[in-house]
Curated annotation (Swiss-Prot):
GO biological process: histidyl-tRNA aminoacylation
Pfam families reported for this sequence: HGTP_anticodon, tRNA-synt_His
Record-stated family: Belongs to the class-II aminoacyl-tRNA synthetase family.
Subunit structure: Homodimer.
Species of the source: Alkalilimnicola ehrlichii (strain ATCC BAA-1101 / DSM 17681 / MLHE-1)
Identification of the protein by name: Histidine--tRNA ligase
Primary location class: cytoplasm
Length: 429
């Protein structure tokens, strides 16, 4: 017997009993985004490698170690997208989306990073992200954070907390970087291998170290907040004031720097303690120089992304599940081939009807067991007599209503009257 083929490590299947919760999450997020004026954009999952090295940063972990990169038959270097923002910007430049407007877009789909799989971290993972272009003031920063707070509330998540920081302008970061490198060089004997590697290429990321032996050193490091220009400082204070007035709790975390080089000014994360080290549920920030960096005209921008696997895991732990949309009715037939045209006619009359049948047939006993397990409220019976007459027997599976026999038109009227109570009770199959 041939050896079975299994999924790749870090790539997971999402099974039918799991998808209702995913659909619940996705539909609620989509409704919230569209209520704030965002429109969906659909992007390729493969882009030129240069797009990510120019946007994310050549010395970031993502570009150095985590991207799935390959050469195609033309010799071009291509990469499975590790995140969505760079592709969104590329699309906006290529298709003229930034000309004379302030587009708001959202996207959803799989991303790919060659990381070590663990709870909350996968090599293929699903993100939903949203981006706003052309708005530079603190109002859009505050609105986006308030929108993410509403989005998480709509999903029923309560034990998440908000952390904020500002990364200032490029000039402020350059001044802070010089002071930070000088400080770290003076304590180089206390740096771990990863920090030594980053010292001259990306020292800001050292502040985000997870090494407990370096926490005290990092706590005493120069703070970016002390190097901010006045515009960045007042911008951040305005964002915080709006959150205060709206009653959204937050903590300013000066070590919050995000893992992508393109961020500037406001950055934020919603985090939880329930996912171990992978505690970030949703994160984002402003990236005012990225559009120009990729080849467009200077365009301010802000965005966020959330990981669906982490969000779904949190909801499952909280006992939240999506609606199980089983059939309204289950067809029990003596001959499925003769029954199918009658069933299709019923679907034509009631397009919203969820109707399931066992096309392989089987005994009435086994079909009724299957009907009961499906969660359907009704069984529509097509025995030999019903098939000969072109009528349906109607049996109530959840109540004690008397069984009756109806022609297709009368059955359509009957189902329409009972529509509010026909939702499936529970799918147990």
């Amino acid at each position: 017997m041939a050896k079975g083929i299994r999924s790749i490590r870090g790539f997971s299947d999402i099974l039918p009993e799991q998808t209702p919760l995913w659909q619940f999450v996705e539909s609620n997020i989509q409704a919230t985004l569209e209520a704030y004026g965002y429109r969906e954009i659909r992007l390729p999952i493969v882009e030129k490698t240069e797009l990510f090295s120019r946007s994310i940063g050549e010395v970031t972990d993502i570009v150095e170690k985590e991207m799935y990169t390959f050469e195609d038959r033309n010799g071009d270097s291509l990469t499975l997208r590790p995140e969505g923002t760079a592709g969104c910007v590329r699309c906006g430049i290529q298709n003229g989306l930034f000309h004379g407007g302030q587009p708001r877009v959202w996207y959803a789909g799989p991303m790919f990073r060659h990381e070590r799989p663990q709870k909350g971290r996968y090599r293929q993972f699903h993100q939903i992200g949203a981006e706003v272009y052309g708005e530079s003031g603190p109002g859009v920063d505050a609105e986006m954070i308030l929108m993410t707070a509403r989005l998480l509330r709509c999903l029923g998540l309560e034990d998440v907390r908000l952390e904020l920081n500002t990364l200032g302008t490029g000039e402020a970061r350059a001044a802070h970087r010089a002071a930070l490198v000088e400080y770290l060089q003076a304590h180089e004997d206390r740096l771990d291998d990863d920090a030594r590697r980053r010292l001259h290429s990306n020292p800001l990321r050292i502040l985000d170290t997870k090494n407990p032996d370096m926490q005290a050193l990092v706590e005493q490091a120069p703070r970016l907040m002390d190097y901010l220009d006045e515009d960045s400082r007042s911008h951040f204070q305005a964002v915080c004031r709006v959150l205060d007035q709206a009653g959204v709790a937050y903590r300013v975390n000066p070590r919050l720097v995000r893992g992508l080089d393109y961020y500037s000014r406001t950055v934020f994360e919603w985090i939880t303690d329930r996912l171990g080290a992978q505690g970030t549920v949703l994160a984002g920030g402003r990236y005012d120089t990225l559009v120009e960096q990729i080849g467009g005209k200077p365009t301010p921008a802000i965005g966020f992304a959330l990981g669906l696997e982490r969000l779904v895991s949190l909801l499952e732990e909280s006992g939240i599940s999506g609606p199980q949309s089983g059939p309204h009715a289950f067809v029990v037939s003596a001959d499925s081939l003769r029954a199918l045209p009658l069933v299709e006619g019923l679907r034509d009359r009631l397009p919203g009807l969820r109707l399931q049948m066992q096309t392989e047939g089987g005994s009435f006993r086994s079909q009724f067991k299957r009907a009961d397990r499906s969660g359907a409220a009704l069984a529509l019976v097509l025995g030999e007599e019903e098939l000969a007459e072109g009528r349906f027997g109607v049996k109530d599976l959840r109540g004690d209503a008397e069984q009756q026999r109806l022609d297709p038109e009368a059955l359509s009227d009957y189902l329409a009257r009972r529509w509010p109570e026909l939702a499936a009770t529970e799918v147990t199959d």
